């Protein structure tokens, strides 16, 4: 196939100025060799609750994990070089603006350089993709993310002040705000302090000043000199799109909300999804690139990745229900343990069968007899998992417009119905 990638940035400006962590298994899935310099010790994560009297929880190391840590720019350039070796062409400085619709089919793209016709458009434009946002309603491709579907994140590296005491734990996730607000992390590296502040509500840089100052005050080894980064980016933290294919169109990565919902990391899922898409296209001997062909890609994704991602998204959807104090109470009462958090971080919770998950949550409910509000919120999760069990069988094995429409309606209505709405909660 003749493949051309259109990118609005220049080659030199590609990639955010920070490091990414993902598991080596994703590279193996895609059949890619791993540069030895990317291999790194597994991160040991500590959760720091609001109440300073509650002991932070440090997760045990996931012995099955094989962590890779690489600068984003290096990762992108490595993947570009592999693509170029395979014959892919890259056009830089040309922004994708909209799809070209030829009847019911996507027949190309409109870019800042003109109209580009093609047989298949692969949408990797990101969380705010102009292609996905313009897809017609009949395709059932959801145009916009909903409330609490996106985290607005500030990430930067600050100087590390020599001589100041460093935290006992290197990688700290700080839960000092209610779930409807967001969270922060602070990672102490050899030569810098890596800071991320995430908020569900959109804001400019001024909105991150207060939480940034709180980190300065709490962690004396964090200096005020910005070394690099300092940009605001949006990360999808939700279930994958119900439908991400149409005639002549397939979405991958953040364009289809393919991230691990409790982390926001999408590199592993994107590598795997790209591989599944390539496999489906190779089976299309007539190069029709229509819904029949591309549904095989979506089906493979949901069966191998997507439904596990949905179960993880259910757990993420509980977070906005919780106040910072409730999180501290859960830690103090040992309702949430290091083992629970380790499973959530590794993704093994998401792969549990619904019946196993419900049993696990019911066990926790017995520990919450003295906390009626928390017990009710956890009970909601039991109901969610039960409802998801009913929805999954509606996923069509073959593409049929009516069947796909019914699937998308059930799927989207379910995830929208379980969202927490603060205004509604205050009026109850």
Regions found by a protein language model. Name each.
Residues 82-222, 257:
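Predominantly flavin-linked oxidoreductase catalytic cores and closely associated redox partners
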